[in-house]
């Protein structure tokens, strides 16, 4: 029996360190830890794919938390079934559960459904917060790009930089930068 570890974060801004430390503390060797920095909504993850190829019957995979293996109930169940068919057990350190046996798989299925429901609630609250912010005039996303040709046309007509900035709702420094870039080219 070999013990492997798996860790995943959803974004590149998040850190894998805590999860890696947890599986190491549970006895997993560093060269047997597989990681991904990707959304759990997709099961096509490089680290997970390598782990799938590496494990054999009798092996155990340790994951810090249930939602680190997958975020969607169907995908989670599919992964657990796949590992089970290979004779590989998955154990979730923080949750204290394992896919060994029928009871373990039932608990995992229930917990993954609960985790999915919690994510939906979080998404609902996030969307409600965004809608409230929009009503208050808070804008989201990247600022719109400036049409350089409009700036240049207004300048050629004799409009000053301050007035151009005011008309286009952009910073005066942006107007100067566009004019400077035009002179340099």
Swiss-Prot record:
Pfam families: HTH_7, Resolvase
Domain of life according to the entry: Bacteria
GO biological process, one term: DNA integration
Molecular function terms from GO: DNA binding; DNA strand exchange activity
Active site annotation, chain numbering: 10 (o-(5'-phospho-dna)-serine intermediate)
DNA-binding region(s), residue ranges: 161-180
Occurrences of domain Resolvase/invertase-type recombinase catalytic (ranges): 2-137
InterPro entries per UniProt: Homeodomain-like_sf, Recombinase_CS, Resolv_N, Resolvase-like_N_sf, Resolvase_HTH_dom, SSR_resolvase
Keywords for this protein: DNA integration, DNA recombination, DNA-binding, Plasmid, Transposable element
UniProt family annotation: Belongs to the site-specific recombinase resolvase family.
PANTHER family registered for this protein in UniProt: DNA-INVERTASE FROM LAMBDOID PROPHAGE (PTHR30461), RESOLVASE HOMOLOG YNEB (PTHR30461:SF26)
Function: Resolvase catalyzes the resolution (a site-specific recombination) of the cointegrated replicon to yield the final transposition products.
The name this protein goes by in its record: Transposon Tn1331 resolvase
Organism: Klebsiella pneumoniae
């Amino acid at each position: 029996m070999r013990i492997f570890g798996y860790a995943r974060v959803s974004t590149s801004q998040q850190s894998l360190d805590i999860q890696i430390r947890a599986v190491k503390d549970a006895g997993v060797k560093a060269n047997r830890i597989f990681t991904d920095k990707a959304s759990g909504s997709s099961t096509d993850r490089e680290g997970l794919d390598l782990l799938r190829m590496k494990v054999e019957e009798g092996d155990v995979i340790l994951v810090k938390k249930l939602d680190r293996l997958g975020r969607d109930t169907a995908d989670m169940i599919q992964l657990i079934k796949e590992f089970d068919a290979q004779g590989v057990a998955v154990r979730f350190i923080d949750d204290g559960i394992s896919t060994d046996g029928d009871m373990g798989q039932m608990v995992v299925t229930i917990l993954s459904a609960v985790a999915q429901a919690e994510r939906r609630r979080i998404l609902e609250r996030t969307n409600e917060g965004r809608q409230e912010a929009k009503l208050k005039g808070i804008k989201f996303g990247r600022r719109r790009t400036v049409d350089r040709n409009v700036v240049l046309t207004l300048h050629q007509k004799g409009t000053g930089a301050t007035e151009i900035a005011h008309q286009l709702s952009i910073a005066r420094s942006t107007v100067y930068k566009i004019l400077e870039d035009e002179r340099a080219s």
